[in-house]
Each structure stands twice: as structure tokens, then as C-alpha cells.
Amino acid sequence: ALPSEFWKAGSMKERIYVCHTYYHVYVTFLKELKLRREQKDCGEATLVLSRLSNDFEQLDERIRKTGLFAEIISFDEKRDDFFPELKKYREDHGNIVFNMINRMIFTRKYARLEEAYVPVDFREYGDIYVFCDSDPVGYYLNQKKIPYHAVEDGLNCIKNFDAARFENRGHFGLKAWLSRELNLIFVQNGYGKYCLDMEVNDISAIKYPCPQYIEVPRQPMVDALSGEDKQLILNAFIRNREELERQIEEGNRIGKKILILTDPL
């Protein structure tokens, strides 16, 4: 983060969060509410909702009504297969030298093509938080040399699946070095050159922790929520809250119930 004096000069906006799932948005609420409790003069934040893997429907409208964020912006993020000119650079030639050269070209071209769909100037923000920087935004920020904070995609997700190591298996150390030190390719989850750090829930649970990992447990943020905080979150996430509460009240008079929660991801 930049010094607080910089904010007072009005030179930059404070924070921006890039979310790809409802869970990302939930953790963003936890982080932002915690910050508001601890720093009364922390300023306002911007929330970016990527449509890459989720249809957020009217979530942005409900969040806007809470007043927690200064802006809610939709991001029409594009996967690499949206750009047919990138296909040839993803082919496996069976040779690490040829593959790495193609990957270097792919990394630069992908970031350049993605730029047309980026809805915000990230350079205007002092702190950028990105959930799942393996998505196109990670390529974009690193190629544009814009520092950012990565945030663990799910709860202890790297413990169960270390995507960076799996997707870069075979000469991982070399690939991590090409990404972290030279920015010639991009490796997610803390190995990008412009990734300042990556927040994870529990470092001790991760078999191969990256030096950039910092531990930010999520349960204490949940435990610290006030009644008012919880109501704000409910108002943001529940689409037909009054109708749902009415159904629950009616169900209480009938007897035992089962609530089934599903997640498309």
C-alpha cells in the first residue's frame, strides 16, 4: 500500500477488488468490513465482478444498495480460447525450449488482447486485490507491470490442489523463475513478478508454500462481524429475502425441514 499522505493528496483511489465467484465477493465483504472497523479513515473501495465463470445476476444492484463500495463494475473477462489467434501458441511441440518460446509469445499477446475488455484503469488504485489471478486479469496486470495482491481462491484450496505446481509440472523451478524474476511467462498464485503477496487462510496446511504467501485467517473475520454487518451481508446476497424468511417461518410451523445449498462451481 502507498502512504496515507498519498491518499490525502487525492492522487489515487484506495482499493479495488476483482472477484470471480460469490465466495470471492463474500470474502471481500469480510475484508472490507474488517478494514472499516479498524480504520475509520480508510476511504472507499471499488468492486469488480468478472463474468468469466459466473452469472452474478442482480448481485451488483443489491450490493450497491448496501453502500459499502463506491463503485461496482462489471468485467467481461475473456478466456484465451476467445481469441483464435492464440491457439497455435498453446500447442505442445514436445520440446521445452519451443514450448517456452511459444508460451512467452502467448503471455504477451494474451495480455494485449485482453486489454480491450478491461473496464478500469488499475493504475488509479493503490491496492489491488485479485482472487484467482490465474484468470486473464493476472496475465494483464503482470504484463502491464501493475503490482497487486493475490487472494486465495477458496478456503484452503491450495492445500487440496496446488494449481500453480500442477499446471506447471515438469521443470517447475525454471517456469517459476521465468515468471517471478523475468516476467517472460506467467505462473499464478504468488509466482507472478508483480504479485506483491498472496493471502492464504493457513500456510501450515500448504505442502509447498510460496515465499509470497502471507497468512490471513478468514474465521476471525467472520467471528468479528457485528449484527449490523451480518444484516448487510444478508441483504447483499439473498435475492428474495422477505419471501425466503416468510417461507422459513411457515416451515417452522410444519416441522423438520431440509435446506439444500448448491454451488455451480
What is each of the regions a protein language model found here?
Residues 259-265:
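Extended, amphipathic alpha-helical scaffolds
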Residues 74, 78-81, 229, 233-239, ...:
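General structural signal for secondary-structure boundaries
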Residues 16-192:
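Active-site and donor-binding regions of nucleotide-sugar-utilizing enzymes
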Residues 11-15, 42, 123-126, 250-259:
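A short, charged/proline- and glycine-enriched loop
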Residues 152-154, 159-259:
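A nucleotide-sugar donor-handling region in carbohydrate enzymes
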Residues 3, 47, 218-220:
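Charged, low-complexity surface segments at secondary-structure and domain boundaries
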Residues 1-11:
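Short, Lys/Arg-enriched N-terminal segments with co-localized hydrophobic residues
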